[in-house]
Amino acid sequence: MNHFLEHNKTKIDTLCKNHKVKSLYAFGSVLTPKFNENSDIDLIVDFKQQDILEYASNYFNLKFALQAIFNREIDLLEEKAVKNPSFLEHINSKKQLIYAD
């Protein structure tokens, strides 16, 4: 795991538990030597079953809390919302687990 993510692992775990996250993965530049102070962080999340209002609240609160922790833009994709099979295959081939419940 990237040291930038690992350094904040306890905070990430707490956020994921509080926002009913089933799994959270990183992908993209955060996992490569290209990651720098200007890079955003690409994450893909799968939430536990919940009603739509609770889901929306958990999604946005998680995204904003992660942005506050990392002090940078977070590109948070919802796993079920990725419809492009090629893009999903690319993500799945590169992603790294950050949290699982």
Feature map (PLM): residue ranges:
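Catalytic core of pol beta-like nucleotidyltransferases
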Residues: 1-25, 31-37, 50-101
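Short hydrophobic/aromatic beta-strand micro-patches
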Residues: 44-46
